[in-house]
UniProtKB/Swiss-Prot annotation:
Keywords: Heme, Iron, Membrane, Metal-binding, Monooxygenase, Oxidoreductase, Transmembrane, Transmembrane helix. Its cofactor is heme. Pfam families: p450. This is Beta-amyrin 28-monooxygenase.
Amino acid sequence: MELFYASLVCLFVLLLSLSFLFLFNKKNKSMILSCPLPPGNSGWPVIGETLEFLSTGWKGHPEKFIFDRISKYKSSIFKTHLLGEKAVVFCGASSNKFLFSNENKLVQTWWPSSVDKVFPSSTQTSSKEEAIKMRKMLPNFLKPEALQRYIRIMDHIAQKHFQSWENQQEVVVFPLAKRYTFWLACRLFVSVEDPNHVARLADPFDVLASGLISIPINLPGTPFNRAIKASNFIRKELVAIIKQRKIDLTEGKASDSQDILSHMLLTSDENGKFMHELDIADKILGLLIGGHDTASSACAFIVKYLAELPEIYDQVYKEQIEIAKSKGPGELLSWEDIKKMKYSWNVACEVLRLAPPLQGAFREALVDFTFNGFSIPKGWKIYWSANSTHINPEVFVDPLKFDPSRFEGNGPAPYTFVPFGGGPRMCPGKEYARLEILVFMHHLVKRFSWKKIIRDEKIVVNPMPIPANGLPIRLYPHHVKT
């Protein structure tokens, strides 16, 4: 009998708790829904404000879309309609902190539909789910001891790369920077080092990257259509590489730790299943895009700013030539050398602030929530903008001035410098990018000084900033008196 009464009491308490929880959630949701949506405009039917969002980048001023609306609505949060989706743009350090701190709680990563169509996974999962799996695989490849091993490989390839610059009076920087970073990615991800093989893959990757974030109209000649064709071509090439690697692993001609491709082939999931060839090709394709595109933009803009600012160039040269003098004949760069490149990295960071390869990124609201007094409905897309802090005079004094000293000591305030994102979604290849950029700077400045040929070359952002004419420069080798 006592057990019966005890059970009744427990049941009563449980029902009371559930009722209270229901009322609390209902009240909480009511409070959320009672808050207004952020101010803003949905633009034209169907396309919304997508064309204006993209066109400001094509004109070289992607921040204009952001700052014009901040000024118009007197709010750092505003609603819009982008890439076929209802969206809210979050601006400022507090917004960055909120989004990065609530990853997988209130928001999750989101890609436009064009990305899933350009990267048609061989599995029945979305690119979002595949990215989560990929991020679980990367730590072994990007752990400190692995990165330290890559420095020698990067140095070796950089030396071979800059041989193509020698005996040239003029070069066009951006395509050469892309060749350098793509060569590194091919070597370190899939052990493809032959220049002819790298070149065969490089051009389709350029087409793919330019059409990745585009209006998904699959008609002949559109950037989206060209991106799909390029993706299909690259996947076939990668499948051929994967098939050969399987043979090489079986015959002992390849090792299980030589690159991320071997790791993928030999690693099973929690159910003991191995990935299919097309699945691996999808993931390698994504890695090759992320592993070279952003760094090539950064390298090109480093060349641009060092040409415009000879006093900055002189300081970088001084640091790098001291490192070069400390090396014996044929001795490759080491981790200790990289740690000495402090001023060079401050310069690179200032370049990333003024010309961030990652202009921003999208999230999706997992639930209804409020922020800064505004209601954000479940399912709406959220875009955060790097430029909203990077060139904001309230965050960085005289924001358009090139000043590497901003990164001395503790550097910028948290959540204000976000070229690699932040929180759980921070780019896992940040340290990899740092190494390839610093190795590039080392070999560039110890060999050459240079001048821009087009003084006021236009910048185009699509989706990353690139010089409209590729940044042609005139080279002055250091061993030649000029």
